[in-house]
Amino acid sequence: MSARTKARKRALDLLFSADVRQISLAHALAVEAERAANEPAREASWLYAREIVDGVIDNQEEIDEQIETYAQGWTLARMPAVDRAILRIGVWELLFNDQVPDGVAISEAVEAATVLSTDDSAGFVNGLLAKIAQNKPRDGEVDR
């Protein structure tokens, strides 16, 4: 498992935990930072996990708006918590992290959904993220 895949899993754990426990992402991140300080072997995954969670915190309104726009017939509240977390990471990587190719972001999210969620979740995640990737503004393009 690559360092980035481990980081995505770590970020997913943080997003899911904060959602289910109904605590702020900032608090969950602070607790994890304290834990990470004592685990130098996991530093590489921690750095990208933190970048993901910080990115979701900074852009959550737009991320959630994108999810709600393309999740035909589904509200965020109706989705399983693990799917919300997977989608938030995927949308952040698609829209706010130019270092991750769209196909990689989608593939990683689908794999997480396959392993961690319901039988239907992988297809749902794939379809939703593919629509967002297809409709996102490209370099030099004005927001729609």
UniProtKB/Swiss-Prot annotation:
Pfam families: NusB (PF01029). PANTHER family: ANTITERMINATION NUSB DOMAIN-CONTAINING PROTEIN, N UTILIZATION SUBSTANCE PROTEIN B-RELATED. Belongs to the NusB family. It comes from Leifsonia xyli subsp. xyli (strain CTCB07). InterPro entries: NusB-like_sf (IPR035926), NusB_fam (IPR011605), NusB_RsmB_TIM44 (IPR006027). Keywords: RNA-binding, Transcription, Transcription antitermination, Transcription regulation. GO terms for molecular function: RNA binding. This is Transcription antitermination protein NusB.
